[in-house]
Every structure is written in C-alpha cells, then in structure tokens.
Regions:
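Active-site-proximal loop/turn and secondary-structure-junction residues that shape catalytic pockets
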Residues: 21, 52-54, 88-92, 132-135, ...
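Gly/Ser/Thr-rich helix-start
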Residues: 17-19, 65, 90, 155, ...
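Glycine/proline-rich, positively charged
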Residues: 95-168
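N-terminal binding-site loop/beta-alpha segment at the start of enzyme catalytic domains
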Residues: 1-83
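Short beta-strand segments at enzyme active-site cores
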Residues: 47-51, 83-86, 125-130, 160-161
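Glycine/Thr-rich phosphate-binding loops of Rossmann-like dinucleotide-binding domains
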Residues: 25, 56-58, 94, 136-139
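N-terminal small/glycine-rich loop or linker at the start of catalytic domains
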Residues: 7-25, 85-101, 125, 130
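Generic beta-strand or strand-like secondary-structure segments
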Residues: 67-71, 83, 87, 109, ...
Length: 168
C-alpha cells in the first residue's frame, strides 16, 4: 500500500515518478517509457513529475510531457487520482557532443512554454507547475511574474520553484 501525503491541495503518494530518464538521451525507447510509467501507476504511484525540457536535444521537444499524456491516456486505472507536475524555464541544446540545459526565465517565454506544456499533457490546467531553474539573466521576480500569469490565466492550478537557493 502506498504512503500518501498532502502536496499543497493534492493528496498524492509520498513517492512520485520522475519521468526525466525515460525521454532524455540514452533512454530505452518509447514503449519502455510507457511500460515503466504504467508499472509505477499499477504499483500505486499517483504523482508524476516531468518537464518541458525533457527531450533529447535535436529531437522533438516535450517528449517527456507527451509520453506522460500517452501513458495516462492508455492506463486502465483511475486517472483522476494522478497528480502531474511539470516545469518550465529550461531548454535543451548541444555544446559539441555534450547535452546542456540553457535557462530561459523570460516571463513571455515561460508563459508560452506553460501553455505548450498544458497542450502536450492534454489538460486544460496543469496540476502543479514549477519554474525549473532560476535564470541569472532575468530578475527572479520577473520570472515569477510569468509563472503567476499562468496561474491567473488558469493554465496551472498551483505553482512552485525548483532548484533555488534560500537567497533566491
């Protein structure tokens, strides 16, 4: 039996499934990704974490969010019990032969990415949306205003931040 906790207004499992390794470089393929998410859900997991930037650089963007949508659409369990969190504010690129994670905290881009995330996930409103990482080129409060705009527009129900320091 899974242990449940409150995450803001959501009553969800204390342990969630981080989707990143299923869609970034060196992943084991689409079908294995679907099977893996189904196995987690079947085992009682009710929280999935993904991000706009979970894809292999140079390939289709947002494959992580799209994989989560497909897994939830094809899963035979109670979809309404599953909380999905996603993040915006990072992109993917290559520097030589090394994958990198450029930051993009411009409010207008965060708003665009948030709307794209809702579409990729197939939802009217994202359960929980995070600012993925602070962009040092953009004042922190400006990035937060972009996230707040997504809340105000109903694109996301709740918001948070990820990978930040106490000072930020």
């Amino acid at each position: 039996m899974a242990l449940f906790r409150n995450l803001g207004p959501f009553h969800t499992t204390a342990i969630g499934h981080g989707e990143m390794p299923l869609t970034i470089e060196n992943n084991r393929g689409h079908d294995v990704g679907i099977e893996t998410l189904h196995a987690s859900l079947d085992a009682g997991c009710r929280h999935i974490d993904t991000a706009w930037a979970y894809y292999t650089p140079g390939e289709e963007e947002q494959t992580g969010e799209k994989l989560v949508r497909e897994a939830l659409d094809s899963w035979k369990g109670p979809r309404e019990e599953v909380t999905v969190a996603t993040k915006v504010g990072l992109r993917r690129a290559w520097e030589g032969d090394k994958p990198v994670w450029p930051r993009d905290g411009k409010p207008e881009h965060l708003i665009e990415y948030g709307k794209q995330s809702a579409m990729a996930l197939g939802v009217d409103s994202i359960d929980l949306l995070y600012l993925h990482r602070h962009d040092p080129e953009v004042p922190y409060n400006e990035s937060c205003e972009g996230i707040k705009a997504l809340l105000d527009q109903g694109v996301a129900q709740w918001a948070g931040v990820s990978n930040v320091s106490i000072e930020q």
